[in-house]
């Protein structure tokens, strides 16, 4: 290589820069990915550590922002003209595709972080040309700056779009904070080509936790399963996909019909004319992708999904014309100019029904996608669609509510909602808990209650396990779960196998006795069972530390309340049941991924760092908090004592480990010289000695002088977990 091609400073070739070259992942593809525990650090956030988005949002004049957005709707720009002179449908699609990545399986995806701005979502095939929607919003974002995040602005723009076209939204809540780097924890599928669908196995069984049918799609393939224009089969895909996004059949029909009341699809020409996506586009395009060589590349020449046309004759007006069109014609299968399957009315007069989006001298027939026709052909969807057709007000309310759910589902409880447009109505999918209506216990009463709990006969193991079971349901992905509400005493959580439903009532009954005795006293000072469950765990941790020679106080903040069964959607909460909980050495069945990968996944959902995950495992083991009393990983002869024995014994070179199961998931540790059996372990336990990064952390806690640090770090991580979901 000539000198001209080398860096003039270092003499290196252009490929020899920091971060390049063969990576650890290249050498060891199956290496445990701990990077997902350390995403979104302050080093990537330009806003600074003192920035408080909630406080900034309170300064926002939401009505002024709404006025500016309404004006933008009809301010068509030559560089990207508005269809029908109105950007409303475009912004609805942007907001929908921001929120529509949410899936209930792990709570990941959704609109809560503004991730549509970043790879891979900014370049998904289903998001073609939404980069222009965000650029249209830039002048408004520029004006309001830090007072509104991109995440909130995209959703609010969708709300304003709906209202500007004639339907009052159910409400809007702010509070979504932007991220500044792509989310590495989200499993979008393992396909290596856009629109690949190896996520299916057997009889079209979709891989969990995925919801979309193909890589790079938000929902279903609008042309039908794998492009097969079969409306009945498409209905099955629609049902599964929307169900995995927390929508029932009525909500699904309302969303599809309501969303497709507005706007049009774009498939004016061959997709081969379209250039690379934003991430692959040349630098001079400044983050805009999909530059098209077809005609003007915009307006009437736009190519996006490949499907071409509008659903209704009134694409920028809220009305019932979607159902009028769906049920008013018989439909013929045809191909768009881009070669995509779509349906047109058999009636030739329909060719005059829809105005052109840019040329008033032209008209077109309405179109339906195969997915649209599933609302007419599916035996469950069809009666719902007909009822909505006959009852426009019911349809309008159903769509407004479903849209609110779609765009707010991943925000968690109402306590996180910000702004003057938050609806008053409490909704079951928000996982409501009662407001605090009593005086909270003080430090003296906390100490007294701790003593009563420890004197009740409940063991350290049981108290720690119960508190963990209550709090560790939290997942930060959609801000659900946690100790608030004490739902461990309600269906479905009380019956989860991991919570040992045969033993759980004894503990809950004793805590309820203590609660009732305390609350029967005069005055307005009360304690909830939710608080007592956590307090019991804290008392047990304190006792464990005392047993190890450390006199500590575990932090405790009261204020949790007890939810009722009526406030708890059993079906909705079922998805929070842990398939595995490595902190309790529990795994329901054998999975295709390793137990240690499942541990890291759960730790990420609980916002734990690698050091926090490590110290919690070590503490939970010596506190004897394993599922069903298992002794795997209890590397101590003093269970119930919060010491660093787990680490010192794991790192002991006098122990030799061998697998005792064909799948290498259970192990025994024997004395290197005598062969005497010392310990048993799972992969979860041994990964802290096998993985180089985790071993480095384990060595910190395995040192002879680390006892106090271990206790303090465990308490800090424990307190963090106990307060997850408290907003």
Swiss-Prot record:
Covalent crosslink: Tryptophyl-tyrosyl-methioninium (Tyr-Met) (with W-96): 219-245
GO cellular component labels: cytosol
CDD domains from the UniProt entry: catalase_peroxidase_1, catalase_peroxidase_2
Pfam families: peroxidase
Protein family: Belongs to the peroxidase family. Peroxidase/catalase subfamily.
Subunit structure and binding partners: Homodimer or homotetramer.
Name of the protein: Catalase-peroxidase
Gene that encodes it: katG
